[in-house]
């Protein structure tokens, strides 16, 4: 370092200005370093500087003890291995159906025992029934059917019923049969294979052929006249046409008379006629479409002059007064539509209470309709099951005896009902079996 410059030391002010502050700065640095390092070591007590370990020494294991703690190979094989998956059960899984609810056990799964745990040996021939139902935690519950398994028949179906109950059951059986008859009669009629009709005689056929032939000739005559007029105009050497009108003549031949006239007027075909025959043909060609048209072509006027025979169209010019009148009418219509829309909105605001009443009434009707549907569905379930397959359940006919079949004794009873068929229909009605189509054997 360079040599410090000398300063004046006269007076107290000069002495104070040149006093060195290095000692103070060193002290502050030391105190800061001690605070960060945990305190001054020279002032710390001995207990904080040293630690006396008073714990006992662990005994040294001998070689024999270590050898005894080893697990043999045969023992390790018998213990459970957490990395090996369990053998799956051979029981098939139950298929879930619409009417089957599967409830799984919500108990927490037990953690698999570690390798060090001892395996528990169970007696295979013991009578311990503990945990017999705990092996399968899954339980199956089915919705109970509203229809009972064994239904009690009406008293009129008995082998010896009273007169009133027997008549009631006969009326019900007749109603079921008549319902089937009405269903077939009111259904759509089948498509008939043959249609009945009167044969035509030879004279009637002849008159029909003549009418068809005359209608065809009328159409052909009109088309021939139009085409001949166009061919004459095209083949005449004295006719001068514009270059763009050659294609128009081809189009005229394929069009109807009225369309041909319009096409000639639109394209402004310029024709110079030097002969009377050509002039007459042109007039006839232009007047073919005007038959029966009185006031349709008032705005469009066709003039054929003798000098040039030019075909022109005159249109009416729209004046400023007419345009101003149309603008005023348009603005008036627009204003009327706005006023009508405004009046409609005001009427809707005034009728707001009525609208709220209608909405409340509609909600009430919807709720009542939903309630009726639920009740009707429950009533239907009491009679027949829900549809499970392709075919609907068909209730068997009422097993009621006729008057001549009633004997009043079980010994003389006619064997008409079978228990197997009754049980089969009961299973279908309760929704246990899917209804199938009845196969008739001939």
UniProtKB/Swiss-Prot annotation:
UniProt superkingdom: Eukaryota
Broad class of the protein's primary localization: nucleus
A Pfam family that the UniProt record links to this protein: Nop53
Keyword Nucleotide-binding belongs to the record: no
A GO BP annotation: ribosomal large subunit assembly
One Gene Ontology CC term in the entry: nucleolus
Localisation per UniProt entry: Nucleus, Nucleolus; Nucleus, Nucleoplasm
Keywords assigned: Nucleus, Ribosome biogenesis
Region (Disordered): 242-264
Keyword hit for Nucleus: yes
Known role: May play a role in ribosome biogenesis.
Family affiliation: Belongs to the NOP53 family.
UniProt name for this protein: Ribosome biogenesis protein NOP53
Species whose genome carries this gene: Arabidopsis thaliana
């Amino acid at each position: 370092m360079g040599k410090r410059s000398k300063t004046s030391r006269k007076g107290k002010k000069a002495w104070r200005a040149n006093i060195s502050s290095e000692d103070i700065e060193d002290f502050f640095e030391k105190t800061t370093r001690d605070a960060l390092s945990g305190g001054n070591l020279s002032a710390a007590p001995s207990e904080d500087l040293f630690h006396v370990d008073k714990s006992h020494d662990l005994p040294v294991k001998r070689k024999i003890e270590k050898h005894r703690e080893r697990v043999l190979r045969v023992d390790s094989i018998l213990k459970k291995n957490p990395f090996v998956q369990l053998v799956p059960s051979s029981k098939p899984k139950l298929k879930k159906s619409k009417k089957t609810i599967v409830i799984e056990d919500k108990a927490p799964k037990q953690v698999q025992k570690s390798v060090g745990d001892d395996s528990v040996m169970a007696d295979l021939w013991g009578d311990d029934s503990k945990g017999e139902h705990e092996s399968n935690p899954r339980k199956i519950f089915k919705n109970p059917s509203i229809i009972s398994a064994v239904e009690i028949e009406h008293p009129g179906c008995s082998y010896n019923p009273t007169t009133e109950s027997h008549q009631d059951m006969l009326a019900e059986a007749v109603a079921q049969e008549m319902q089937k008859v009405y269903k077939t009669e009111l259904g759509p009629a089948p498509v008939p294979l043959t249609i009945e009709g009167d044969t035509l005689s030879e004279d009637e056929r002849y008159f029909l052929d003549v009418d068809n032939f005359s209608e065809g000739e009328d159409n052909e005559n009109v088309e021939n006249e139009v085409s001949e007029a166009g061919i004459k105009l095209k083949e005449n050497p004295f006719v001068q046409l514009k270059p763009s009108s050659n294609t128009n003549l081809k189009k005229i031949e394929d069009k109807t008379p009225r369309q041909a006239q319009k096409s000639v007027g639109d394209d402004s075909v310029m024709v110079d006629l030097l002969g009377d025959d050509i002039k007459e043909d042109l007039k006839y060609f232009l007047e073919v479409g005007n038959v029966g048209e009185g006031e349709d072509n008032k705005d469009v006027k066709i003039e054929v002059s003798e000098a040039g025979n030019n075909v022109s169209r005159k249109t009416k010019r729209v004046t400023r007064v007419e345009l101003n009148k149309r603008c005023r009418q348009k603005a008036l219509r627009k204003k009327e539509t706005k006023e009508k829309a405004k009046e409609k909105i005001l009427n809707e605001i005034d009728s707001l209470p009525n609208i709220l009443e209608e909405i409340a009434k509609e909600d009430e009707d919807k709720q009542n309709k939903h309630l009726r549907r639920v009740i009707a569905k429950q009533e239907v379930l009491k009679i027949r099951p829900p549809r499970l397959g392709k075919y609907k359940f068909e209730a068997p006919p009422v097993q009621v005896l006729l008057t001549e079949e009633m004997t009043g004794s079980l010994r003389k009873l006619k064997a008409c009902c079978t228990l197997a068929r009754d049980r089969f229909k009961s299973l279908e009605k309760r929704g246990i079996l899917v209804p199938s189509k009845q196969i008739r054997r001939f």
